[in-house]
Amino acid sequence: MSQPLILAIDQGTQSVRALLFDTTGTLVGRGYQPIEPYFSDRPGWAEQHPTYFWDNLGQACQALWENTGATPDQVVGVTVTTQRGTVVTLDNQGQPLRPAILWLDQRHADIQERLPGPWGWLFRGLRLDDTIDQFRRNAQANWLSQHEPDTWQRTRHYLLLSGYLNYRLTGQFRDSTASQVGYLPFDFRRHQWAGQRNFKWQLMPVRKDQLPELVRPGETLGQLTAEAATHLGLTSGLPVIAAASDKACEVLGSGGLTPDTACLSYGTTATINVSNPRYVEPVRLMPPYPSAIPGHYSTEVMIYRGYWMVSWFKREFGLREQRIAEHRGIEPEVLFDELVNSVPPGSMGLMLQPYWSPGVRHPGPDAKGAMVGFGDVHTRAHIYRAILEGLAYALREGKERIERRSGTEITTLRVAGGGSRSNAAM
């Protein structure tokens, strides 16, 4: 019998990857499809058509079969992980009503009045009403109901991107509990939709019947439909297994299984995560997200625009290195590492505050990025090193906060994400 394989699909912000693993976790095949992260019809908006994600998922699978010796009949199961917090609205026929609103989107609902009733009184008494109102402003459902009421009226299914792709794979509206990261009426302590009397239902107009059925990671979501099987180049009827969000899978894959082991993610969003069987909030009223390990929590500190800032620097200031790298047939990262190494630690007093986009609770919705300490000695190289150092210090601050909140010392660091390929960043 040929070796059984699992097809894992990673739908990220900038690419789709179709990955084949054997039963020991060894990668045996890879297909890669770059995508346009989003389009923006207005400043601060970030949208993409749901069908665009699905079409490119198929392209990634096609690239996989063209570049591996493995065959589709070896695949015994399929699983999907996606970017977090991207919202898809479908009508009663399962068709998208509008472009997906990505996690990068910066639009806000207009909140004029405080939350009424007993919950509102309680939050005002605890001085948490500003936090609650920020949640209401950020919830995409509130913006949709205010600015696109016809669309919201027709919304039968309110899904994250993971739920949409699992629907396209199985024909069922089911999703993993470990993928529910966003502005949703989700009980992060119990890993289920919030109870009927929970205050979260008052924060947004979402109904429970609009949400998918939830399944624990590792359990079966459904079977691959004939249409989806053709799209992926597989046999219909294969089990589709519940995975987790991309960050949660990254933590699991890097071996972050215990509270004393932290996973640093050098991705578009830079994070430090710790898996814990206990519910530990990194900041008060900021819940730990569901872990890929059933029944566990992922305590996370996030730098929203993390290693996106590295891409920003390369785009705005790194054209020379990119052209030289193309001419020499090497990766641009080699030259950028040389740029960093030409500058002493500390960037000769140039410091960066890495908040190109604000946080909800920390550092707060009004935070701004800044570079401080410029002098006549500073060059592009100093700016680049200051970016890396600013991110590193922000992640260190996150590590220390998690240690204080959990009462557990972090003794091991695991590093993942695109930025981990840079020796200078490491």
Sequence positions of predicted segments:
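Short alpha-helix plus adjacent loop in nuclease-associated cores
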Residues: I101, D105-G120
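Short beta-strand-loop/turn "lid" adjacent to the catalytic site in phosphate-handling enzymes
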Residues: E66-W103, D129-F135, N166-F186, E213-G218
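N-terminal glycine/serine-rich phosphate-binding loop of ATP-dependent small-molecule kinases
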Residues: M1-P99, R114, R154, A229-T230, ...
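Conserved protein kinase catalytic core
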Residues: V16, Y38, V87, I111, ...
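A short local loop/turn or secondary-structure capping micro-motif enriched for an aromatic residue
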Residues: E36-F39, Q106-H108, Y307-W308
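Active-site core segments that coordinate phosphate-bearing ligands/cofactors
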Residues: L7-I9, T23, P116-I132, R136-R174, ...
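Short alpha-helix boundary/capping segments
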Residues: W45, W103, V301-R305
